[in-house]
Amino acid sequence: MAVTRMLAELTVPLGGQRIELQEIDYGTGGMPLLRIRIREGRRFTVFEIDAQSARKWAEEMLAWSRKSQ
């Protein structure tokens, strides 16, 4: 059985999308995953990604954020 731990929740100011970041541990000796859950009205988009992919995504978002300020 998977164990889920909430890491962060935020609302995007433009558009009002709700974003949740959760750590998922499936408990079968596998690696933990990061679940990114985006709610837009009644629609959900869900990604489950590994630590390496999360790091690359975070680095790209941070680089863009720094350029755009």
Positions of PLM-derived features:
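Positively charged, low-complexity terminal tracts
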Residues: 1-69
